[in-house]
């Protein structure tokens, strides 16, 4: 089969393919004969339908099928022989000029780019660090105590204050009409916990049981309830009950209730520190990995295949629709989504993927079985039965592939950090936790 390849622009190529007519017709006849042995048609016994009838009924569709198969096979064989790395699917059309006895086709497609990565020793990366402090452990202990707090009714003349659980009836109106979700009876919340909007909490703070109050509340413009977002409502609230919170003591009983094996405060704090350290490590890795990837992309020169970018745009759009559907949005699959919204993120993902792949290939940064095992062991260590978790990962190739991808990213991160100009920046525990 004769093949010619023409460069159209940047990554776009045009390949002209020729197929002997005899090969196509021979395959068409072969498939029609196989079909004739199995099809059932009125007026004929099974397997006894005349070939001319079979050809008349199915000839066009079989010919179309054969052409697709043969041209596709010819294209990818030719691309492999020419050592072309094809990005996406080719656009194939019949050529106007066909040699006698042959059919010619033009395939227009893109190839993956040659990736040029600059001198990584000049790349600048800010590497952050953070430690688990006693203050962070104290705050976690307080959170655990709050999760196990109990409540008792306060005296009738007591005023609601932060930490109290209050029971209220309320009714909110916009332009004189009660809005959806604007009315409730025997509704409970903790004053000061941030469950309610600030103005609502301020209105109930200081009220006593049996008191009623009217007030105005402005909903934020980005409020999740779109019908009331950015609008001001008139509220009437009646406070029916106030309950004081009682936190458990920090002692062996609390430790035991939290599953600490030795049921001691020291054991509880050690367990909290271990869990917080795991979270700190994960966040530092993610942040530093992001900084490395930003630096890596900045040092690379390459053109992006439009086919790859479009495929990534489609994936992002599908993910966005799935998220809307999961949140109960009606007709999420029909929601208008301009592609331009997703294109910058898609381009970055494709660019980063190509750059990382080149760095891995040229520096042998593939994941080793030992690295994969070590990573899975680290993941499994936080579970009650690590051996079961290990088996769960190794029982599925897709899960293993996900771990391998993470290990490769870690290898790339360590490789770049070893060569780049790295500046260290220490963050407090709270600063690290506050960042997304």
Curated annotation (Swiss-Prot):
Family affiliation: Belongs to the FKBP-type PPIase family. Tig subfamily.
Encoding gene per record: tig
EC assignment: 5.2.1.8
Keywords from the named record: Cell cycle, Cell division, Chaperone, Cytoplasm, Isomerase, Rotamase
InterPro entries reported for this sequence: PPIase_dom_sf, PPIase_FKBP_dom, Trig_fac, Trigger_fac_C, Trigger_fac_C_sf, Trigger_fac_ribosome-bd_bac, Trigger_fac_ribosome-bd_sf, Trigger_fact/SurA_dom_sf
Signal peptide segment: none
Purpose of the protein: Involved in protein export. Acts as a chaperone by maintaining the newly synthesized protein in an open conformation. Functions as a peptidyl-prolyl cis-trans isomerase.
Protein name, entry field: Trigger factor
PROSITE patterns: FKBP_PPIASE
Localization of this protein: Cytoplasm
Catalysed conversion reaction: [protein]-peptidylproline (omega=180) = [protein]-peptidylproline (omega=0)
PPIase FKBP-type domain location: 163-248
Top-level enzyme category: isomerase
One Pfam family linked to the record: Trigger_N
């Amino acid at each position: 089969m004769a093949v010619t390849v023409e460069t159209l622009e940047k990554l776009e190529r045009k390949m002209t393919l020729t197929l002997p007519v005899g090969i196509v017709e021979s395959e068409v006849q072969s498939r029609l004969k196989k079909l004739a042995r199995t099809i059932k048609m009125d007026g004929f016994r099974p397997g006894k339908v005349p070939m001319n009838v079979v050809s008349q009924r199915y000839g066009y569709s079989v010919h179309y099928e054969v052409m697709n198969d043969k041209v596709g096979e010819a294209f990818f064989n030719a691309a492999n022989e020419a050592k072309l790395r094809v990005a996406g699917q080719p656009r194939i059309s019949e050529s106007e000029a066909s040699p006698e006895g042959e059919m010619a086709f033009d395939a227009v497609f893109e190839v993956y780019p040659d990736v040029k990565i600059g001198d990584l020793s000049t790349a600048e990366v800010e590497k952050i660090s953070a430690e688990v402090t006693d203050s962070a452990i104290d705050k976690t202990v307080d959170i655990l105590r709050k999760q196990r707090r109990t409540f008792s009714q306060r005296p009738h003349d007591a005023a609601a204050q932060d930490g109290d659980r209050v029971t209220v009836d309320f009714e909110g109106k916009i332009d004189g009409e009660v809005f959806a979700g604007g009315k409730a009876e025997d509704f409970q919340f903790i004053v000061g916990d941030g469950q309610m909007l600030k103005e609502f909490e301020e209105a109930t703070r200081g009220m006593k049981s049996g008191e009623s109050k009217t007030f105005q509340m402005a909903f934020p413009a980005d409020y999740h309830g779109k019908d009331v977002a950015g609008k001001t409502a008139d509220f009437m609230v009646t406070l029916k009950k106030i309950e004081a919170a009682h936190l458990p003591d920090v002692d062996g009983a609390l430790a035991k209730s939290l599953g600490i094996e030795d049921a001691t405060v020291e054991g509880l704090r050690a367990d909290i520190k271990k869990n917080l350290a795991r979270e700190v490590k994960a966040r530092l890795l993610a942040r530093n990995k992001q900084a490395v990837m930003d630096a890596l992309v900045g040092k690379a020169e390459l053109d992006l295949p439009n086919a790859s970018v479009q495929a990534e745009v489609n994936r992002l759009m599908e993910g966005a629709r799935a998220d809307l559907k999961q949140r109960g949005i009606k007709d999420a699959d029909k929601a208008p989504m301009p592609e331009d919204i997703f294109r910058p993120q898609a381009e970055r993902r494709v660019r980063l993927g190509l750059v990382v792949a080149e760095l891995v290939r040229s520096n042998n940064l593939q994941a080793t079985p030992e690295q994969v095992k070590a990573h899975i062991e680290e993941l499994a260590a936080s579970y009650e039965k690590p051996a079961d978790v290990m088996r769960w990962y190794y029982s599925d190739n897709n899960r293993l592939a996900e771990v391998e991808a993470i290990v490769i990213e870690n290898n790339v991160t360590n490789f770049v950090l070893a060569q780049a100009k790295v500046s260290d920046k220490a963050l407090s525990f709270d600063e690290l936790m506050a960042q997304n």
